[in-house]
Amino acid sequence: MQIGNTSFRRYGIGKVLYELYTKFTYFLPILVSNYKFRHLLLLPLYKEKAAANYYPGGNKKVIYMVINESTFSGGLSDRLRAIVSVYQECKRQGLDFYINFETPNLIDYLQPNEYDWRITEDEICYDPKECYPCTILTYHTDIKDPYQRFVQRTLLRHFLKKRYRQIHVYSNMVTSDAVYGKLFKELFRPTDDLQKLIDYHLKQIGGRNNYISCTFRFRQLLGDFKEGGDMLLKEEKEKYIQRCLVTVVHLHEQYPGECILITSDSNTFLKRVSTLDNIYVIPGKVVHIGFTYNADRQVYMKSFVDYYMLSYARIVFLVRDKLMYHSGFPYRAALLNDAEYLEIMLSQ
């Protein structure tokens, strides 16, 4: 009998073996990646930095880390959900929590709200004898899977128990939907520059909860975004764009009179969709923060504006098909201010 057989995994020894198999497949990739990234990337990098770094000591610190070399942590929403997850556990244990987020420099866009998470470079220890860098990555696509959250939380608690002065966490681990918005707001509020842009666009579009949003996540399909994934042939791109435009038209038919905020990683598509009636597009170029380290501050700013503007929509839609990426960005934004979230299939 195969372990994937439904009858086999429901009863007796089959049930026991299936549970062990399931636990193994959740824990193993996270542990293997932690070993790999620690020994092949982080520890050699830390040894180089330790030679030029003096650490003054102090209380045990837990630091969520983003450095240019840590592309494995994913995009903006992946990192924000992990920050909230690590903060939640530190709050539960009474541990000091900090964020070191390079490229973009997080403090240019989000500032501390109720909890001060700022830390300076000279407060960060890179001596492997004093600090423990670790990774907790997400390998199962179902981010709502409670067992995945359990496994990641268990490993985080294991790492936090280690007897080092600092624990550096590199992660895109998932968090509980129920607490995300609350904990995010404890940590963050927009900087003055970001808030001005949010206020401007809210005024232009009609205010909070007076519009709906629709997100298209193409990756490299249209050939104008730096990330992984397939690229459509030239003759296929126009047909695909037309299908996307028809999807927006159908959405207008379902919600007549509603202004639709369109967000996307494709400037090509944003230019095309902006010609439709009652469409709002936030100007600016979009980049993936895991693949772009040298963009202008205002380029990174657009991702944060998009995030907040999605959160203030009445309904947040994500367009899906077998080619487009199942982005967590609009879903996480919807959680921020309790917007309704729906996924719709691309028109044929």
Where are these regions (language model features)?
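Short beta-alpha junction loops
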Residues: 101-107, 266-267, 346-348
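N-terminal cationic-hydrophobic initiation segments that often serve targeting/anchoring roles
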Residues: 87-91, 202, 206, 249-253, ...
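A short helix->loop->beta-strand "cap" motif at the edges of active sites that frequently abuts
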Residues: 95, 256-258, 337-342
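Structural motif
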Residues: 211-212, 259, 315
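A donor-sugar binding/catalytic signature common to diverse glycosyltransferases
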Residues: 84, 301-348
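Catalytic donor nucleotide-activated moiety binding site of glycosyltransferases and closely related
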Residues: 215-223, 245-296
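Short, aromatic/basic amphipathic alpha-helical patches
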Residues: 110-121, 268-279, 330-335
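Secretory-pathway glycan-assembly enzymes, especially type II membrane glycosyltransferases
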Residues: 3-6, 14-22, 26-238
